[in-house]
């Protein structure tokens, strides 16, 4: 687990962009192990 990961199931990195933007203010991240990891 990491501080910039979201407990959100994903199948593609683009599915993480909007949740990452809502959570951290940057629409940038990737799908790792079916979870979203956001870059901040």
Curated annotation (Swiss-Prot):
Cell compartments where the protein resides: Secreted
Entry's Gene Ontology molecular function annotations: ion channel inhibitor activity; potassium channel regulator activity; toxin activity
Disulfide bond found in the keyword field: yes
Site (Basic residue of the functional dyad): 30
SS bond list: 2-5, 10-31, 16-36, 20-38
Keywords for the protein's UniProt record, in alphabetical order: Calcium-activated potassium channel impairing toxin, Disulfide bond, Ion channel impairing toxin, Neurotoxin, Potassium channel impairing toxin, Secreted, Toxin
Entry-linked InterPro entries: Scorpion_toxin-like_sf, Scorpion_toxinS_K_inh
Domain of life: Eukaryota
GO cellular component, one term: extracellular region
Site note Aromatic residue of the functional dyad, residues: 39
Organ and tissue specificity: Expressed by the venom gland.
Pfam families from the UniProt entry: Toxin_2
Signal sequence, start to end: none
General remark: The N-terminal C2-C5 disulfide bridge unique to this toxin does not appear to confer stability to the protein.
Record function comment: Inhibits high conductance calcium-activated potassium channels. Reversibly inhibits Shaker B potassium channels.
Family, per entry: Belongs to the short scorpion toxin superfamily. Potassium channel inhibitor family. Alpha-KTx 12 subfamily.
Entry remark concerning the domains of this protein: Has the structural arrangement of an alpha-helix connected to antiparallel beta-sheets by disulfide bonds (CS-alpha/beta).
Protein name (Swiss-Prot/TrEMBL): Potassium channel toxin alpha-KTx 12.2
The species this protein was found in: Tityus trivittatus
